[in-house]
């Protein structure tokens, strides 16, 4: 293993990278690793990044981890967030091959304007941890659920529609959709917009909740 990418918003500590902790515990000494902090999109960014390293011939094998301990940043007195999030982890191995399959394409979006709707107020360099921030519960997740719901339904469907259009695919060509497990309403609304049969849309949120960066690899 020459590369480990850990996708997480709940790292063990600010530094070193959790990927390096994983490498050490797995006895991997002759590679490199780094973390990607990109919220619910993190695993897709990590998968794409690792694939590019492999495709370029820079590494032969890479591991992408999605791991979260959302319970560490969830306020269990906040009914808007505490029923939603869960803890979990999963990993995938990518390696070079001559076989005619693999990652066909990717569509990635980010929109910094939405930061006000979903964030963690304190704990970073803008607002370091203090007695005041702890007392104000500013180290927990803050989410405006309705705003996030509207954006997620539109953008998840748009990204899927774009990648299908670019590759001349229809809903009949799709064996399974592995969506981020944000919540059941978002998943079902996205599947409906894409005109996919419900049995093609994989769901495990009822078991694990929203594990942020870990949802997609856990579905795999």
Residue ranges and their predicted role:
Residues 2-5, 63, 175:
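Conserved beta-strand elements of the Class I
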Residues 7-13, 38-41, 66-71, 109-111, ...:
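Acidic, glycine-rich active-site loops and adjacent beta-strand->loop/helix elements
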Residues 10-11, 24, 28-30, 38-58, ...:
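Claisen-condensing/thiolase-fold acyl-transfer catalytic domains that form or cleave C-C bonds
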Residues 13-27, 64-70, 125-133, 186-198:
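Acidic-glycine-rich active-site phosphate/pyrophosphate-binding loop
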Residues 55-89:
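Flexible, glycine-rich active-site loops centered on histidine and acidic residues
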Residues 78-150, 154, 158:
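Condensing-enzyme catalytic core mediating Claisen C-C bond formation in acyl metabolism
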